[in-house]
Structures are given as structure tokens and as C-alpha cells.
Amino acid sequence: ITTLEGMQGKLDTAAAKCVSNYGFFIGATEDNVEDLQDAVGTRENPIAIPGICGIKIFMGVSTGTLLVSDKTALEKIFTETAGLIAVHAEDEDRMNERRKLVEGRTDVAAHAYYRDDITALLATKLSVELAHKTGHRLHILHLTSGIEADFLNDHCNLPSKTEGHPIITTEVLPQHLTFD
């Protein structure tokens, strides 16, 4: 969902059906900064709408229009919006280069080969660079590699220890707990 109207529909459905707490991210595209601002505001005028957690960016290919791989578009989102930005960190250019290496493969290992550690690290580094440049709050979704963890070790801090630096956090899914 990439518009405030769509988000409101999802929030209304959740309010009618959910028995637990909930929250949703509005999806970023390369050309919906104004929609993002409607949902989370700008740096100068942040908005807090209950149930909207922040902005989610897919830096590598996803579903529909949910892809923001252009650095200029990413920088615009980081610069012109408020709140939390959560990223699925995968470098689209590297994935496009590697796609031919797995063409015709259907084995489960093809996915990990195609979307390798470097693919994740490149996008993670770019996200962190933009967070530092803009002071934007950043969360790296679903950390997948030890090299990303090593890189982020110098960039992730508890909110109480971030004076002068943006808050950058991450998390990991159980299936990725096979770091080297």
C-alpha cells in the first residue's frame, strides 16, 4: 500500500478484525514522496498517525511497484520524510548482474546465490550512508549475513547512545541465524 487512503483502508480493516495490537508500514516507490509525506510528514512537520509505523523501502526487486533502487530517489525519501524508514536491503544492480548466473536453476540454493551477502551489504551500506547524511531513523529489516552484522556493529546504537548520530537498528529472522 503506497497511499494514505490505502493505509486508512487497511487500518480500518485491522480495527474491525484484530484482537491484538497492530501497525503497518506505507510502501515507498520511486515517485510517491508526497504520499509518504501525507502518512508520516516531513522533517519540519512530522505526523504521527496511530497504526502507521513508518516507511518501508524494498531496495531490490519485490512485488508490483514496491522498488526503490535509484540513489536519487532514495535520497529524496530520506531527505523529505519524517519517522522511521525500514529497508529490505538488496542491491538491485548486483541482483540484475547475478540473475543470469542462476537462469534455469530451480534448486533452493539458487536464491541465496543470486541474492548473496555482497548484494545485501551494498544496499545496507547505502542505507546507512543516507541515514548518516540526513539524520534519518533507519531500521535494516531481516539482516541476512555476518558481513552485514560486522558492518552494522559500528553503526547500530541504543537510542540513549546516539547523540549526534541517527538511530540505526536491525533484526534477524531465525532462518538467517547461520552467520559465519
For every predicted segment, state its role.
Residues 1, 20-34, 110-118:
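Active-site mouth loops of central-metabolism enzymes
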Residues 1-17:
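Metal-associated gating/positioning segment near the N- to mid-region
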Residues 14, 18, 26, 40-43, ...:
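Generic hydrophobic/packing signal
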